């Protein structure tokens, strides 16, 4: 009996040790919700072991082009207390789409290309998704997956223009939603000035340009622009707590500076007394509030590097 009991104990110890070995390194999938004054943080293992800085590709260029600066026009369109570009221009379905920058620090290109796509629809009635790949790989003034400047991106749209996604789709490797953002990052692919083989489009004839580009000197000017002409690109500083954003109006609370990130601003408003911008991120719908977030106006420099243009 004692021998049998000893064997049972030994087997239990072996199995326990084996189980521990199996579980080492596995995602816990645990969720910890923290309620801040204006927003909710949901801590998960989504960003564990990820070099988040590689996602944050906004790099101010020392050779940044000097753009026209727009100010608030008191005689222009009046600014409402809240605004949502998605509901204001319902026929432009790209406004509400959440993209996936995948294994690449291409946020600077996504913010520009998404906003320009929306504006082609709003102003020219063109329902065409501009190619992220064209800008990421062929904009020689920026550094592709290593990062870029939003101002340079819009200048490239003005000078060179981008082809459509139908001509040149985004082929940066992605990963399952549960692994967003991706663990491994890639080098920038080579520029291919040809449409994909199954497309009837011709690269040189499929270019879509911006006629004019500009930045802004105030929140009032930014909001008036969104109401008048549609979404804009905005770049800001990402801190550690932003990664766990889930809902509410984000206000930087804790954590270190991780880098610069660019997104698309689609609206604004006030929630519980806090003035905010509404933005679409490009980390898939698994992040944040189905891929979107609200951020306090002016927080983290969200009002400092904003750029847009007209076709």
UniProtKB/Swiss-Prot annotation:
The keyword Hydrolase applies. One of its GO terms (cellular component) is extracellular space. Glycans are attached at residues 91, 198, 290. One of its GO terms (molecular function) is cysteine-type endopeptidase activity. The keyword Transcription regulation does not apply. Keywords: Disulfide bond, Glycoprotein, Hydrolase, Lysosome, Protease, Signal, Thiol protease, Zymogen. GO terms for biological process: proteolysis involved in protein catabolic process. Gene3D superfamilies: Cysteine proteinases. This is Cathepsin B. InterPro entries: Papain-like_cys_pep_sf, Pept_cys_AS, Pept_his_AS, Peptidase_C1A, Peptidase_C1A_C. Disulfide bonds join 92-121, 104-145, 138-191, 167-195, 175-182. Its EC number is 3.4.22.1.
